[in-house]
Amino acid sequence: MQLVIAEKPSVGIALAKALGVTEKKDGYIEGNGYIVSWCVGHLVSLANADMYDEKFKKWNIADLPIIPDEWQFIIAEDKDKQFGILRQLMDDNRVTEVVNACDAGREGELIFRLVYNKALCNKPIKRLWISSMEEKAIRDGFDNLKDGKDYENLYQSALCRAKADWIVGINATRLFSKLYNRTLNVGRVQTPTLAMLYERENSISNFPKEKYFNVHLKSVGLDAVHEKVKEQGEAENIRRDCDGNEAIVKSVKTERKTVNPPHLYDLTTLQREANRLYGFTAQQTLDYTQSLYEMKLVTYPRTDSQYITDDMSDTAKNIAESVAGKLPHFSSVVIAPETKRVINNKKVSDHHAIIPTSEVSSTDLSSVPDGERKILYLIANRLLCATNEPYIYETVTAEISCSGYSFVAKGRNVISEGWKAIEKAFIDFQKCKDYTEEEEETLSLTEGQVIERPVSEVSEHFTQPPKHFTEDTLLSAMERAGTDEITEEVERSGLGTPATRASIIEKLTKSGFIKREKKNLVVTDYGTDLISVMPDIIKSASMTADWENALSLMAQGKFTSQQFMVDIEKLVDDIITVAKETIDESKVSRNGGEVIGTCPRCGKNVVVTPKAYSCEDRNCGFVIWKNDKFFEKARKPLTKEMATNLIKYGRIAVKGLYSEKSDRNYDATVCLDDTGKYVNYKLEFAPKKKKK
């Protein structure tokens, strides 16, 4: 008899149904040669530090690093009953094999193995590895169970990831919390992610906003532009010279462009698209997709592949055709799926791309909850787009001369809509208000053509800072480990995995390090305080991505767990050494907070607090508020570096201050004007150069 252990009850029940197991017991189902039971998420986890030694209940820098010689594991307090049931079932003499039917991925392997090992079971392990919860897929999976030994490397990878998070989290959190006298939660992956968000906020805050002007030359079906004139007066002169005067088309260049269909979804690209179109968080999308998977409507969600295998070609084509017939908005679109471009056996390892299942054709989609239904439509639409023809168009660039000035007009002529027709039909059907795509107008001009009496206008613009991260763009940055470019040929590593990135974002939010402002993710004062004191060694996105890559190689048997743990332990030693070398007592206030200078009033420390830079002696009262109205009106955020220099020198040179009166930016020296009761500011300007 086989004991089948699923990751959670709902999956266990679905497996039992597919196997014809019907006799319900307390915590399991029995019959037809099987016992089907389940975990409830993580039943067993790594023990806390104080389980190794009572002294670790108190946080002391002298005790660091804390690195267990022999790792201990504990049963979750509220889950001991289910663990007891599983242990009893494993001991059952009727059971000859244990089938690991937990999630077919790294975390599912860990959940099962920790329970199996904690129960001291030594019976043979078989592995169920499926990408669909359809009953046929389940039965096929049981007909082709894998040897559990084949997944030993995956287990070691999962266990090392858990140990690394434990070691870095406990040691770094205790170290920096004690150094700065306040709780600073540090994580192996979450801290580099927070650092990326912080750097983006800094780029936005310090962006030198500059005004410029465009001069337009307009006629019927034409809007040519002379771009980025710095001075308004110069732009007005161009406008006056050109307005109503004859213009001539000097040249017309055309270029044919082909845009291939998008890839099928992996989890990350699905999360990004759902955030962009619907505003769903990464966690919401994962939850909805997991629900659809358990409803047998889509394939396995936690995948990093955007392709299917060649043996799935006919199935994918049939599903695409049935999905197209199921969704009314495709009635006016030609559907002729071609799967050749979505097949790549080399780029499918554990699981293929997320696609709908054949169950969709026989399901009443109106009964599917709204969130899940939107994700299902998104996945179905992507399958149809990915298997359609390329989008082909022609760009047109015309150079136009008027009164000695050069203007450029751009347009686009569509040759074949291809997959774009499907996407547009989908967007209209879903009424995605936030969906935007720049589309150039059709342009029809010939070289030498004369444009009579065009109208000339001036438009005002500002250079734009980088945009705040959304979950869409943050997921992309995490996938790329903070770098800007990644090619199709390079194997992707990154911060976290497709399965864990959503939880990292949620953890940063729940910990108060970041907050959501509509779709934007913004670093809080608490997050700023944490990152501002972290050494580069723990903020490095690329280094953390290297660890993730090592874990991936370990799962493939190409990197040893022993070497990984040696490297992680060295990392912790380096973090502690660097922190002790760079942060001494002069940098830490007895009352908590990083010291940035000496109070100009009383000579005591000025420390960083969530809302200000203030004297540690409350009786002194010296404080520089982070949201001071002077800097808010000037649209120039007061950074820690600016506050440090104000305190040290009494003045700072600042570029790009904003004047409400003139609606212009200017440069000036901001001087600290401390009355002894209030901190004010005054401006000094460099003397104007005399004209010779």
Where on the chain are the PLM-derived regions?
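Short, polar/flexible loop-turn hinges at active-site or ligand-entry regions and domain interfaces
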Residues: 71-74, 102, 122-126, 147-154, ...
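Metal- or metallocofactor-binding catalytic centers and their adjacent structured scaffolds
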Residues: 232-265, 271, 542
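Intrinsically disordered, low-complexity regulatory segments
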Residues: 1-162, 166, 464-465
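Conserved short loop/turn motifs at secondary-structure junctions
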Residues: 1, 101-104, 181-183, 254-263, ...
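C-terminal or mid-to-C-terminal helical accessory/interaction module adjacent to the motor/catalytic core
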Residues: 93, 137-219, 254-258
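Amphipathic alpha-helical transducer elements in NTP-driven molecular machines
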Residues: 9-16, 33-36, 40, 76-87, ...
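Basic, low-complexity terminal or inter-domain segments flanking catalytic cores
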Residues: 2-3, 79, 90, 96, ...
